[in-house]
Amino acid sequence: MTIPKPEIIAFGDNVVDCYADHDRMFPGGNALNHAVFAQRFGARASYHGAVADDAAGRHIRASLVAEGVDVSGLRSLPGRTAFCVIGNRDGEREFLRADLGVSIIAPRADDLVRIAGADAVHTGRSSHVDGHLADFADRARLSYDFATVRTFEMIASIAPLCYLASFSGGDLDAQSGLSLARAARQSGAIWCLITRGEAGAVLVGPESTTEAPAAPTQVVDTLGAGDTFIARTLVGLLRGEAPGAILAAAAQAAAQTCGHLGGFGHPAPTEIDESHAMTIDEIYAAPPVVHP
């Protein structure tokens, strides 16, 4: 299979990442980052998500337009655009507080029609659309970011739907990462990617297992590096590139992302409504509000 310029829809979460010690906000979020990086890597990318009509939402929309991403699937809803405030403790990034705002949405009929016309659709754990993944996979190749979730039940239910299943495995040694990738493959994923930060990555497919080291870089901020790696891998697979070439290009792209603040740039002065902010623990403990 070779698709020179694949069409990819990224569905789900977005956020403005607000750096407390810089008074700057950057557009981000797993699905939104994926759309931008896929577009940069030569795909035709569309982002389907939701923002509010506030400063953060307008900045997200403008940033996507500036990157050439199709925003016809970006909804504007009453409420607040999602944000996360990021601090710095002894050189380590710390997530201080956040608000999911209107960012968690369910797919509508028009979203599914658009997905059916695409080559692939990307989403992930942070988008909270697991109940709709079968609908996605029925219409296009599904790329799903499990992040750090590795429960048997989740892998067994989602991996069979996946063209590309991706995991963040910075805490895994090489053998554990390889075992996880093979478990996802055995559960039904066609391709499985494990990113391990500075320890490199492994891509397991129908006929090959390919490992690659991380590319050297001066790390400023790792936010968005995993999304970069996944997007470059998906684009490469759809183009029919060799796994080794895909991983080398993805590692180089992720290294570049680590060299600056924010997922893909576009800083603006922080302007958010913190009246509904919660701690990160509270965010994870509370069921998300899903907007129709």
Question: Positions of the model-derived regions?
Answer:
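Conserved phosphate-binding/catalytic region of the ribokinase-like
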Residues: 2-7, 178-292
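Short, acidic/turn-prone active-site loops that include or flank metal/cofactor-
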Residues: 31-32, 99-101, 146-151, 169-173, ...
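Active-site metal-binding loops of divalent metal-dependent hydrolases
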Residues: 13-14, 170, 228
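Histidine-anchored nucleotide/phosphate-binding helix
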Residues: 31-40
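Hydrophobic anchor at the start of a short beta-strand
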Residues: 8, 45, 71, 141-142, ...
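Conserved beta-alpha-beta core of the PfkB/ribokinase-like small-molecule kinase fold
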Residues: 119-183, 199-201
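Positively charged, low-complexity intrinsically disordered leader regions
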Residues: 1-23
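Conserved N-terminal subdomain of the carbohydrate kinase-like
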Residues: 16-19, 25, 43-120, 274-292
